[in-house]
Amino acid sequence: MKYSTTKIPPAKMNSSADKALVKSPKLRKSQQKPEGVCQMYFMQLRSGLIIEKTSCYFRKEITKRYSPRTAEKCRKQCLVFTACHQQLNKDFTSDVPMLQKCFGRANVPSIQEYSASLSTYNDQSITFVFEDGSYEIYVEDLRKGQEKDKVLFRYYDSQSPSHETGDDVDGQTLLVNLSPTKDKDFLLHANNEEHSVELQKCENQLPDQAFFLLHRKSSECVSFECKNNPGVFIGVKDNHLALIKVGDQTKDSYIEKTIFKLS
């Protein structure tokens, strides 16, 4: 029995193979840039613990050119947004109370003063208006050309360590009181009976209602917890400052109502 085989010349074989291949368009070397990519995965357990996993690899990507000003603006916005939201989500999902802290004396030496503009998480400004011998506090959008009011922060030493909550932001918690920079004798007070925040004149002894625990969520995001009422924060309600109990809020509502920005 005979068998016949058909031999295909190598040149023809290569030619046939080439026809089956689809060549992708080549990019100029100037358009290709090796880029390190890191992906972060998070898994939250029922206990509130968040497990993090990171995987990194390199890829080539067509470069996109931005002006230095645009690139820097995008970078800052991304950093603030990411840092703020990661810490906020961590605080909110914790089953442990956000802060439990003990203090000795109500009046302790001031260690630092800092002046800054205060705005809400939605970029509305906090303004102080003096009317009929007292101040009114408003949360509003600024008119064109209107300057932001400045708030004077006085930082105090707590004299005793904070309660361990498993939240690393506790190590950055400070005791503060707040007043308009143009009238330092008036301080923010927490009115627990009316669930409101008021500016009252203080000359000598400062009551506990005038002290708040400053939680640093990021370089720009902060929140203010009542010293004498743990779990209750300065927040925004009906375009005014009010006292908000975090346990009664959803996560999104908590972020929008109790987080403030410094600038």
Curated annotation (Swiss-Prot):
Q: Which InterPro entries match?
A: IL-33, IL33_C
Stretch list, region Interaction with RELA: 62-103
Arranged from A to Z, the UniProt key words for this protein are:
Chromosome, Cytokine, Cytoplasm, Cytoplasmic vesicle, Nucleus, Secreted, Transcription
Give the CC-aspect GO terms: chromosome; extracellular space; nucleus; transport vesicle
Output compositional bias ranges, type Polar residues: 1-17
Q: Does the keyword Membrane apply?
A: no
Q: Where is this region: Homeodomain-like HTH domain?
A: 1-65
Q: Which Pfam families match?
A: IL33_bt
Task: Site Cleavage: give positions.
Answer: F103, G104
Compartment annotation: Nucleus; Chromosome; Cytoplasm; Cytoplasmic vesicle, Secretory vesicle
According to its record, what is known about the domains?
Answer: The homeodomain-like HTH domain mediates nuclear localization and heterochromatin association.
This protein is called: Interleukin-33
Claim: Secreted is one of the keywords in the record: yes
Indicate where this protein is primarily found.
nucleus
> What biological function has been recorded for the protein in this entry?
Cytokine that binds to and signals through the IL1RL1/ST2 receptor which in turn activates NF-kappa-B and MAPK signaling pathways in target cells. Involved in the maturation of Th2 cells inducing the secretion of T-helper type 2-associated cytokines. Also involved in activation of mast cells, basophils, eosinophils and natural killer cells. Acts as a chemoattractant for Th2 cells, and may function as an 'alarmin', that amplifies immune responses during tissue injury.
Extract the ranges annotated as region (Disordered). 1-28
Question: Which superkingdom is the protein from?
Answer: Eukaryota
Q: In which tissues is it expressed?
A: Expressed in cultured umbilical artery smooth muscle cells after stimulation with IL1A and IL1B, and to a lesser extent with IFNG. Expressed in vasospastic cerebral arteries after subarachnoid hemorrhage.
Instruction: Supply the source organism for this entry.
Output: Canis lupus familiaris
